[in-house]
């Protein structure tokens, strides 16, 4: 009894969950996003942030229903296999894991990049961390060290993790808010938004969509899955998963939109007249802007924040990625030793060590922030394509399952989120779409090796449940290749008719995806998890009375 009480007390409450969510959401994205978005789209970039929030919010809506039905660690690596079998489960989990394991080095790279531009005299040796815009050999050692520290903070217990991220989250929220106040007081010029449609949208309407994916806006918002992947470690998950996602996503959206507005209105007119929005070249955008406006103390604080903010995100994602890898092992298509949990602290230590090694390999191969960001965005969006089809298939296959959060307008939201995820992949522009296919191809031989070891048991059925997404990704890549010049295609389909084609094709494949589900051993496992969750709810209800 005492042991159960201790385990319950060790679980994450709502306030800790919101701070953990914000710790993941507010990382290097806010430090780069506003500048990147305005350089692509100009003042209309503010609409790109609203659009990014709507895209991710719509996708998250599907996952809240599934996440509350199956509260488990690393949940997002399991959902697709429950309805469509192990191959689709593997594709979704592989894409999700690739995106998550790449967030660990991108945050370390971001911290090191800002360290290299610290203005203090004693920090001069830090300049050797960067070389021609990429991490140098010395910089790599610093990145490795930061990845090790991220991992060590996750190595002992959930309590240590939440204590650390709660402390950092308070700082991460405070500095952007202070930045907003000081920059608005020092330079607030609403005329920077322009006086007509042509000055508000200096580069046309297409960059509104391009900025949503290409400037790191989707990347900045997609961390809502941190909360879902912590599943079984959350107190009252049936209520707190939905609340945690809604609160942390909404707070971060408001913060990001105000930051973008502050960046636009604080920009000196002389600089805009000289180079235009797409000619502004900052190394550390908000710190450089603070120096331009003569607020040197704020610039120094921002240099410190630029180290702390990615640090908090990196720590959060080591926690999530370890649990995702452990969940993938239950699929039976990656080595069993990765599933091992530390009995005392209930932490997947082997998975954490393995992810740290992979993170180091990734950053050795891709040494700049932009390349790592491209890998994250495309892989994440592929994983998200399976959410809407899974939640609809579950409604058909398990109508009597307990749903603590039942999405009310799912028949609209599921196809809408599938279409939006498809468009967001297209907005990433050619050739990023083709790189998604490569990421999946790299994973498939691992899957088929384990199918071979299992004597190809039910392999034909698994392919039948998953072929639609493989074909769809190839079709999306072809559409990106022949699409409009605004999205780096051959311009065989002109803008905005390319969007109409994507929407129609997406709805066709969405329908095929929802009708490709079948009952398997994984669905029976899902039924057991849901039954256990219902019993837990009933027991809690009885004890409260």
Region roles according to the model:
Residues 78-81, 85, 116-122, 127-128, ...:
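TM-loop-TM module centered on a large, flexible mid-protein loop between adjacent transmembrane helices
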Residues 9, 14, 137-144, 235-238, ...:
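Loop-to-transmembrane helix boundary motifs in multi-pass membrane proteins
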Residues 1-11, 391-413, 434-545:
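Terminal cytosolic tails of multi-pass membrane transporters
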Residues 138-189, 222, 245-249, 376-385, ...:
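Membrane-interface loop-to-helix entry segments
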């Amino acid at each position: 009894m005492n042991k159960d009480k201790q385990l319950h007390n060790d679980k994450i409450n709502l306030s800790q969950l919101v701070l953990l969510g914000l710790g993941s959401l507010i990382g290097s994205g806010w430090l780069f996003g506003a500048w990147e978005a305005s350089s692509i789209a100009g003042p209309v970039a503010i609409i790109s942030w609203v659009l990014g929030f709507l895209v991710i919010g719509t996708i998250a809506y599907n996952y809240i229903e599934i996440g509350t039905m199956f509260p488990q660690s690393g949940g997002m690596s399991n959902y697709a296999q429950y309805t469509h079998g192990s191959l689709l489960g593997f594709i979704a989990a592989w894409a999700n894991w690739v995106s998550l394991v790449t967030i660990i080095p991108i945050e370390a790279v971001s911290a090191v990049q800002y360290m290299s531009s610290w203005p203090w005299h004693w920090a001069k040796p830090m300049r050797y961390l960067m070389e021609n815009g990429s991490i140098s050999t010395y910089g790599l050692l610093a990145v490795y060290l930061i990845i090790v520290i991220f991992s060590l903070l996750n190595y002992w217990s959930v309590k240590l993790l939440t204590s650390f991220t709660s402390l950092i989250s308070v700082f991460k929220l405070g500095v952007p808010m202070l930045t907003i106040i000081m920059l608005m007081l020092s330079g607030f010029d609403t005329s920077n938004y322009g006086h007509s449609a042509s000055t508000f949208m200096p580069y046309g309407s297409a960059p509104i969509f391009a900025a949503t994916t290409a400037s790191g806006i989707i990347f900045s918002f997609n961390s809502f899955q941190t909360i879902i992947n912590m599943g079984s470690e959350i107190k009252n998950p049936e209520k707190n998963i939905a609340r945690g996602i809604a609160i942390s996503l909404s707070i971060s959206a408001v913060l990001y939109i105000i930051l973008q507005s502050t960046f636009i209105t604080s920009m000196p007119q002389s600089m805009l007249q000289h180079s235009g929005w797409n000619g502004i070249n900052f190394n550390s955008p908000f710190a450089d802007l603070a120096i331009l406006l003569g607020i040197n103390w704020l610039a120094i604080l921002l240099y410190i924040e630029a180290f702390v903010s990615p640090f908090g995100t990196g720590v959060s994602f080591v926690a999530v990625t370890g649990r995702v890898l452990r969940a993938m092992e239950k699929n039976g298509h990656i080595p069993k030793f990765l599933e091992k949990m530390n009995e005392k602290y209930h932490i997947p230590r082997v998975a954490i060590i393995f992810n740290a090694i992979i993170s180091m390999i990734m950053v050795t191969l891709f040494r700049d922030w932009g390349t790592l960001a491209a890998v994250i965005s495309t892989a994440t969006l592929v994983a998200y394509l399976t959410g809407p089809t899974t939640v609809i298939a579950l409604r058909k296959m398990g109508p009597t399952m307990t749903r603590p959060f039942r999405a009310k307008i799912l028949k609209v939201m599921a196809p809408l989120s599938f279409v939006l995820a498809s468009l967001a992949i297209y907005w990433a522009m050619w050739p990023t779409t083709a790189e998604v296919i490569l990421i999946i191809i790299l994973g498939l031989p691992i899957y088929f090796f384990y199918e071979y070891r299992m004597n190809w048991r039910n392999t034909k059925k698994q392919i039948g449940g998953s072929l639609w997404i493989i074909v769809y990704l190839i079709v999306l890549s072809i559409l990106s290749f022949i699409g409009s010049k605004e999205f780096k295609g051959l311009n065989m389909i002109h803008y905005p008719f390319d969007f109409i084609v994507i929407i129609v094709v997406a709805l066709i494949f969405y329908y095929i995806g929802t009708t490709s589900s079948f009952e398997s051993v994984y669905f029976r496992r899902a039924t057991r998890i849901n039954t256990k969750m219902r019993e837990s709810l009933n027991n809690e209800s009885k004890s409260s009375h």
